[in-house]
Amino acid sequence: MLRIGRELLPFDAASHTIGVHNIATLTAQCAKEAGLPVDVPLVSAAALCHDIGKFGCRGADAKRIPYLHYYYTWQWLSGHGMEHIAHISANHSTWDLEFENLPVESLLLIYADFRVRGTREGGRETVRIYSLAEAYAMILS
């Protein structure tokens, strides 16, 4: 579905998702090795599903993908009996929440999503992994 989406949609969900998955899973494994109580398989599953809601934004909602895909991600995952994954996936870019109230798995996914960004060049999106300093500069500019 992600590869088909690359052809049909203006964003490259496949490359972004793979990048986020790699960063999130590696960071989760490192955190677990450092002694933090991290559910690495949960981080992996949530990273793979975090933008699935973008495919649910149709009609008038298509213009509001950045705002609504969290809701559609939650709806799809919870509707398929994956509430635990839905909770992590749907909170992957919530700047207005109190971070101390989020599970570590959500924080790792937020970090990974923050680092993997796309830029538009020649009508196509190019996805890359940015350094933390570069990611901050992009967000704050």
Q: Where are the model-predicted features located?
A:
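Divalent metal-dependent catalytic cores for phosphoryl transfer on phosphate-bearing substrates
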Residues: 6-7, 33-140
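A positional/architectural concept
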Residues: 15, 19-22, 26
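Generic N-terminal amphipathic, Lys/Arg-enriched alpha-helix
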Residues: 1-10
